[in-house]
């Protein structure tokens, strides 16, 4: 087993019983792949597939003019380079985007020519706006903030059949309906009403009989009946009535007359039910016709028009009901044979026939006019308008698009379904197999007549009792629209607007000699893209609290958004967990509240296929043997197979063991024999999402609490010193690396140089391309603000000289420890009540935890101030502020901006700014005098940026932005100078590193080689030595050595060119940077200057902060207790946290107890290792102990592959506690936890005896810190990974004495953001009334609320020292009076 450089240092002991078959895939692949497919930057112009931008252009172009003599054709598109990189965009508040240019060709045809002849072709590039680019971590920078485009789970295009579950009609009758949903275009619905008539609707408008649509498609009554019915032929003669014998139709019927064979024997007596045996007898007797009673013809419908062959008179029309009068007419006219529709109550209903009778339209045109009137009421139905509307509804590619997915879904549901034998022989089978044979193959992305008829036929067949309705919550009927597809739709809608504008101008293209760029205005495209990324419901402000929240946000799928569901209309079924979610969508992670079940998270191994359906991987099973082959199956494909679970028992050869295996088939759990099994899950954690798979012992937690646990991990604030969880699940490394928080090596190499800002790696020769200077430089992110104001800071995790492989950890980020996700801290926890301080889930915590800064977090706030040009003059950022104390001014520099490093508190001035007062408009003379003698202090007011209330911290950065043409102040200039200086140093360092690396390579390459001559009179044929090279005046002289080996000489020349290019690149980069910094900044209109101040705030743990474990066990810190009062162990160690034991049984999250026990074992093992290292035990003893730890049970580790030095380093990294991995659904068993506890605390150890363990080593004796006495009974103590959540009391605590008031009601505003007061509501008033507290009540309702005069008077009284209230009229009464007047009632107050 090969361990990477990082893994060797801290191997996580895994309790997994099953080997990992499939590595956890790249977690952000859905986002990144989707957008890459949209842009297709990797593909050459002619190799681009019809996806994304290419598809959008192809769908709109060519644009043809109204007269047809000019057209615009699309050739290809190119994306330019973005002007600013990602950090610059964030700082400047702009979008990280690249300019899109399309090459467009204008073709003008000759009007005079008899056949289409090209007269002229003009071609050029057209700017089509800017397309936002995705960052390497799958997000977008829009207007300076990182955003995520969430994938949407919507109903797939196609045809769906369902019923109302008996809810519509009081009888509980099932009303069947069908709906054809296109990707773009009108919806077509078909539905039965309670009378079994079939109707259709377009776009949910008024319903009409379905036969109108069929007539509009060109069918007449006879053809309609011919499609939807089998026929019966009756032969009329003087002897009576006979019919053709169809054996299948007789089963279950009652014989109306005696059925006789040819000899006259009775086969079935009259009145008897016909059985299968009777049918066999009838068939064997060779009967072809049956006698029927003439009365049985009554009520039947004619299948076709009956026409008198002699006179040509229509005796009866198709679908006419046979009555006695009609029969008499037939008799008179000598009709010998009539064909009727075969209808029975059981499985051949008269639905279409009855609907046809309610339909009064005659013919195709009348039907189309009826549809036109329904779609466009009030408009005159001209023939042309009627035709155009009908054709554009479903048959025009411009207005209707079923899409590739929709066509595939449609065909599989209608043309390609499996039919029963009875259906094969019926009208339905004939329709699909004969009439519409081949319709599936020719179906494009618009509807055809066959498609509509096949949908109606399938619905009728459903009502007849054949087939099943669709489950709309099945993941085979819901697909994912990812970022690329969503952006493509927006881009297409923008292009469609452009098309309308272009068509108008195309007619003048020739006469005015226009070029393509004159015709196309790209503003609608830019506007559509900007609107989508800036304000769409699916474009969300990225949750960046910690790496997990970032990854989860990018893996989210939402059923909301445009074209999706709304919270109010979504029922229980849509929100519920569906069997097809297995391995695709997490059944646990979803928000609590109104969005529950509508917003979901992808499971760990899930991915989308080409059609947008979610797939999950399975191992193939052949004849009971599990193979290594892995197939990804969609929900529909999965329904065809029998799939075993990942924990099924296998023998050493991979064969399934046991007579029966637990499996899933068609969404049901079954027991199947091994030979029936076709697939098997790849991993036990396949079912859940990333957040849920980070919960150890998830299988022992109640689902509701696991949901809370998964959601709360996303709210964990990164601690100052991240600490890996002692008990993890093994997926922590994947999350840390894939989130791009931790940096991993792009290529293997040797660490050359490390400091806090960068890591330099010299790439291995075999990974560097020939002639390239193989150096990778990793610049680290330092103290940057995240979207949630948490601190993003990367720390090097390597030292100079370390040898790394590709994928090894280079630097840790926020909330990562050694490349593993570390959201909280490992706390020693005791489950016991303690003086009521852990009542109702409160948390009692030791002062030592706060003092050691275990839960201290750094938050970075960004404060902005802008200087505008007002009507009264320009605002000025200055140090010269009226009435500002010396203490305040000391922190400002000469430009009026706070120094970096200054410690500031609430109310301190950060940026001094004055605004001209608006008392008088100045005359030109006064303006001149002002300009000469300077401004008077009285004429400006202080509008400085001050530190907000309740906030204090340290200034860590200041950025000044100045509009083009306005002179920079000294501070702005010094910032630019220092930035350029730092950048130049960086470039020089890089060049030095490149130089050193290049010459090291050259030295290794040419020492010992023969030369044909060189500097310092090197003789021909002499060997190059190290001494010779060292003796040359400059290393650059090495390039003048003429080598005999031509290949080496070429490589030398390549390296020379490469170094020269690097120098030129560095100079170019410096010039670009300089230009960017020195040119003016783009600011909003009217803004002259903007200053951003970044303040780092240290938040220590305090009472009121919310904390939680990973099992949904949340609580609020009630008290931080002095360490000497905390319960302590026999050896004097106090516990860190005391939790309430009553929080466990009712919540049913037992996982936390198992985690505590295993964590306790991890800590004990760490202590044992620490003692061994302090006693300087030999590496052999350490190896033996670690062998017992890693290879006792669970996954075996190959410790023999490690050297003694690596064993000692591994041991020293485990000093604070061992690292365990308990994968979800395959975690540590109780026996394994006991085994670890015994290893950590051996019974023969005197230290262990002192702790007073119980027999199972799960509880110990604790002592009261205040009295020193032992508690009455033993207490469960252990180690749990505990998190501090983003709900910090510092950000919520708020108090007001006076402040702003509402303009209308004159009552104090509410909420911290408005500096509002506490709400005193209706119920609180009742309480004071109940107590009879009249004076308090009066005060609350008047001077403390909205009595304007009263509160002013009260303020005066307090100043004078008179403590009395003069309560007056509350403003709310005046508001009430005004509202009554607005209703037209005159109301006046009479004063007495």
UniProtKB/Swiss-Prot annotation:
Effect of residue 549 to P: Rifampicin resistant
InterPro entries: DNA-dir_RNA_pol_bsu_ext_1_sf, DNA-dir_RNA_pol_bsu_external_1, DNA-dir_RNA_pol_su2, DNA-dir_RNAP_su2_dom, DNA-dir_RNAP_su2_hyb_sf, RNA_pol_bsu_bac, RNA_pol_bsu_CS, RNA_pol_bsu_protrusion
Record-listed E.C. numbers: 2.7.7.6
Keywords (A to Z) from UniProt: Antibiotic resistance, DNA-directed RNA polymerase, Nucleotidyltransferase, Transcription, Transferase
Source taxon at top rank: Bacteria
Catalytic activity: RNA(n) + a ribonucleoside 5'-triphosphate = RNA(n+1) + diphosphate
GO cellular component: a single term: DNA-directed RNA polymerase complex
GO biological process: one example: DNA-templated transcription
Classification via CDD domains: RNA_pol_B_RPB2
GO MF annotation, one: ribonucleoside binding
Pfam families: RNA_pol_Rpb2_1 (PF04563), RNA_pol_Rpb2_2 (PF04561), RNA_pol_Rpb2_3 (PF04565), RNA_pol_Rpb2_45 (PF10385), RNA_pol_Rpb2_6 (PF00562), RNA_pol_Rpb2_7 (PF04560)
Protein family per UniProt: Belongs to the RNA polymerase beta chain family.
HAMAP family tied to this protein: RNApol_bact_RpoB (MF_01321)
NCBIfam families, per the entry: PRK00405.1, rpoB
Complex formation: The RNAP catalytic core consists of 2 alpha, 1 beta, 1 beta' and 1 omega subunit. When a sigma factor is associated with the core the holoenzyme is formed, which can initiate transcription.
General function of this protein: DNA-dependent RNA polymerase catalyzes the transcription of DNA into RNA using the four ribonucleoside triphosphates as substrates.
Name the UniProt record assigns to this protein: DNA-directed RNA polymerase subunit beta
Organism listed in the record: Neisseria meningitidis serogroup B (strain ATCC BAA-335 / MC58)
């Amino acid at each position: 087993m090969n361990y990477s450089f990082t893994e060797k240092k801290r191997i996580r002991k895994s309790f997994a019983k099953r080997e990992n078959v499939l590595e956890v895939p790249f977690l952000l692949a859905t986002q990144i792949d989707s957008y890459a497919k949209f842009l297709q930057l990797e593909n050459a112009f002619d190799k681009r597939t019809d996806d994304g931008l290419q598809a959008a252009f192809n769908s709109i172009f060519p644009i043809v003019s109204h007269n047809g003599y000019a057209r615009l054709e699309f050739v290809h598109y190119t994306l330019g380079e973005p002007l600013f990189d990602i950090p610059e965009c964030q700082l400047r508040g702009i979008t990280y985007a690249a300019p899109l240019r399309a090459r467009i060709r204008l073709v003008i045809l000759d009007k005079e020519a008899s056949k289409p002849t090209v007269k002229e072709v003009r071609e050029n590039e057209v700017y089509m706006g800017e397309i936002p680019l995705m960052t390497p971590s799958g997000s977008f920078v829009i207007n300076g903030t990182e955003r995520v485009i969430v994938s949407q789970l919507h109903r797939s295009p196609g045809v769906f059949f369902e019923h109302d579950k008996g809810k519509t009609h009081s009888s509980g009758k099932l009303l069947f309906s069908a709906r054809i949903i296109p990707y773009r275009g009108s919806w077509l619905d078909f539905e039965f009403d309670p009378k079994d008539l079939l109707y259709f609707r377009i776009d949910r408008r008024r319903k009409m009989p379905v036969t109108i649509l069929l007539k509009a498609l060109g069918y007449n009554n006879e053809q309609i009946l011919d499609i939807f019915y089998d026929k019966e032929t009756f032969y009329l003669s003087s002897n009576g009535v006979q019919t053709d014998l169809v054996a299948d139709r007789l089963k279950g019927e009652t014989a109306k007359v005696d059925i006789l064979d040819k000899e006259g024997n009775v086969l079935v007596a009259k009145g008897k039910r016909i059985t299968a045996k009777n049918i066999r007898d009838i068939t064997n007797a060779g009967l072809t016709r049956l006698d029927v009673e003439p009365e049985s013809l009554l009520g039947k419908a004619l299948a076709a028009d009956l026409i008198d062959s002699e006179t040509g008179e229509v005796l009866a029309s198709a679908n006419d009901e046979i009555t006695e009068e009609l029969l008499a007419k037939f008799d008179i006219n000598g009709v010998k044979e009539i064909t009727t529709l075969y209808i029975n109550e059981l499985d051949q209903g008269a639905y279409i026939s009855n609907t046809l009778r309610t339909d009064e339209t005659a013919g195709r045109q009348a039907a189309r006019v009826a549809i036109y009137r329904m779609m466009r009421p009030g408009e005159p139905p001209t023939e042309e308008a009627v035709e155009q509307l009908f054709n554009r509804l479903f048959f025009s590619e411009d207005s209707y698009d079923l899409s590739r997915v929709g066509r595939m879904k449609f065909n599989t549901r209608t043309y390609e379904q499996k039919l029963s034998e009875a259906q094969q022989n019926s009208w339905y089978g004939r329709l699909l197999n004969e009439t519409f044979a081949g319709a599936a193959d020719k179906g494009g992305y618009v509807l055809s007549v066959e498609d509509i008829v096949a949908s109606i036929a399938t619905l009728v067949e459903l009502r007849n009792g054949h087939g099943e309705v669709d489950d709309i919550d099945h993941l085979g009927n819901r697909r994912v629209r990812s970022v690329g597809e969503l952006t493509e739709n927006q881009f297409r809608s923008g292009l469609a607007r452009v098309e309308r504008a272009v068509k108008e101008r195309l007619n003048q293209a020739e006469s005015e000699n226009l070029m393509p760029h004159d015709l196309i205005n790209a503003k609608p495209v830019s506007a559509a893209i900007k609107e989508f990324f800036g304000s769409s419901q699916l474009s969300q402000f990225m949750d960046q609290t910690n790496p997990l929240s970032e990854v989860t946000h990018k893996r989210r799928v939402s059923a909301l958004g445009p074209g999706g569901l709304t919270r109010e209309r979504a029922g229980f079924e849509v929100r519920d967990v569906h069997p097809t979610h297995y391995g695709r969508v997490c059944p646990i992670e979803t928000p609590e509240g109104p969005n529950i079940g509508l917003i979901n998270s992808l499971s760990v191994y899930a991915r989308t296929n080409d059609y947008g359906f979610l797939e999950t991987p399975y191992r193939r099973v052949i004849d009971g043997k599990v193979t290594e082959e892995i197939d990804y199956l969609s929900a529909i494909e999965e329904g065809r197979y029998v799939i075993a679970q990942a924990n099924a028992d296998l023998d050493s050869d991979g064969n399934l063991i046991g007579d029966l295996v637990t499996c899933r088939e068609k969404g049901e759990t079954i027991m199947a024999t091994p030979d029936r099994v076709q697939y098997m899950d790849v991993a036990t954690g396949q079912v859940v999402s990333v957040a849920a798979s980070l919960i150890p012992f998830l299988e022992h937690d109640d689902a509701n609490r696991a949901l809370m646990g998964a959601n709360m991990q996303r709210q964990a604030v990164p601690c100052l010193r991240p600490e890996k969880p002692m008990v993890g699940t093994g997926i922590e490394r994947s999350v840390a690396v894939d989130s791009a928080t931790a940096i991993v090596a792009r290529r293997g190499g040797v660490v050359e140089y490390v400091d806090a800002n960068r890591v330099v790696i010299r790439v291995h020769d075999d990974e560097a391309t020939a002639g390239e200077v193989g150096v990778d430089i990793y610049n680290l992110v330092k103290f940057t603000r995240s979207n949630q104001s948490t601190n993003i800071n990367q720390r090097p995790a390597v030292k100079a000289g370390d040898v790394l492989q590709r994928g090894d950890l280079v630097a840790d980020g926020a909330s990562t420890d050694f490349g593993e996700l570390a959201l909280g801290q490992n706390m020693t926890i005791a489950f016991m009540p303690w003086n009521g301080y852990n009542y109702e889930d409160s948390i009692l915590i030791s002062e030592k935890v706060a003092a050691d800064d275990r839960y201290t977090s750094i938050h970075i706030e960004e404060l902005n101030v802008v200087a505008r040009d007002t009507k009264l003059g320009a605002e000025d950022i200055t140090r010269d502020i009226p009435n500002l104390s010396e203490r305040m001014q000391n922190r400002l520099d000469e430009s009026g901006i706070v120094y970096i490093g200054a410690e500031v508190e609430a109310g301190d001035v950060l940026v001094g700014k004055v605004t001209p007062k608006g008392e008088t408009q100045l005359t030109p003379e006064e303006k001149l005098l002002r300009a000469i003698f300077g401004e008077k202090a009285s004429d400006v007011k202080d509008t400085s940026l001050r530190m907000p209330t309740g906030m204090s911290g340290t200034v860590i950065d200041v950025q000044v932005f100045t509009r083009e043409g306005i002179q920079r102040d000294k501070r702005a200039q010094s910032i630019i100078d220092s930035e350029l200086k730092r950048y130049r140093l960086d470039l020089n360092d890089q060049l030095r590193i490149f130089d050193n690396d290049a010459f090291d390579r050259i030295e290794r390459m040419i020492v010992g080689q023969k030369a044909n001559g060189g500097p310092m009179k090197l003789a021909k044929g002499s060997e190059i030595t190290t001494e010779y090279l060292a003796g040359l005046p400059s290393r650059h002289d090495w390039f003048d050595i003429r080598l005999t080996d031509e290949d080496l000489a070429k490589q030398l020349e390549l390296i020379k060119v490469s170094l020269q290019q690097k120098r030129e690149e560095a100079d170019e980069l410096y010039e670009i940077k300089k230009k960017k910094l020195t040119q003016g900044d783009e600011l909003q209109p009217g803004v002259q200057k903007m200053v951003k101040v970044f303040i780092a705030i240290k938040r220590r743990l305090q009472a009121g902060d919310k904390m939680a474990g990973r099992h949904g066990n949340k609580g609020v810190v009630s008290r931080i207790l002095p360490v000497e009062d905390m319960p302590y162990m026999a050896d004097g160690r106090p516990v860190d946290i005391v939790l309430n034991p009553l929080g466990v049984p009712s919540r049913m999250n037992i996982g936390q107890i198992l985690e505590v026990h295993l964590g306790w074992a991890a800590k004990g093992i760490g202590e044992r290792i620490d003692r061994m290292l302090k006693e300087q035990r030999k590496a052999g003893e350490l190896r033996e102990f670690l062998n017992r730890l890693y290879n006792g049970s669970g996954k075996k580790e190959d410790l023999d592959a490690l050297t003694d030095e690596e064993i000692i380093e591994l041991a020293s990294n485990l000093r604070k506690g061992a690292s365990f991995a308990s994968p979800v659904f395959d975690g540590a068993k109780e026996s394994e936890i006991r085994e670890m506890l015994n290893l950590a605390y051996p019974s023969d150890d005197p230290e262990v005896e002192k702790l007073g363990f119980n027999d199972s080593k799960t509880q110990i004796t604790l002592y009261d810190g205040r009295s020193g006495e032992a508690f009455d009974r033993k207490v469960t103590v252990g180690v749990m990974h505990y998190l501090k959540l983003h709900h910090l009391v510092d950000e919520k605590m708020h108090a007001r004495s006076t402040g702003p008031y509402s303009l209308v009601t004159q009552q104090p505003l509410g909420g911290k953001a408005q500096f509002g007061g506490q709400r005193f509501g209706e119920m609180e008033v009742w309480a004071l009334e109940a107590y009879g507290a009249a004076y308090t009540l009066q005060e609350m309702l008047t001077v403390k609320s909205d009595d304007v005069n009263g509160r002013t008077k009260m303020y005066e009284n307090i100043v004078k020292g008179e403590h009395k209230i003069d309560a007056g009229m509350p403003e709310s009464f005046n508001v009430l009076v005004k509202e009554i007047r607005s209703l037209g009632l005159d109301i006046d107050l009479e004063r007495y």
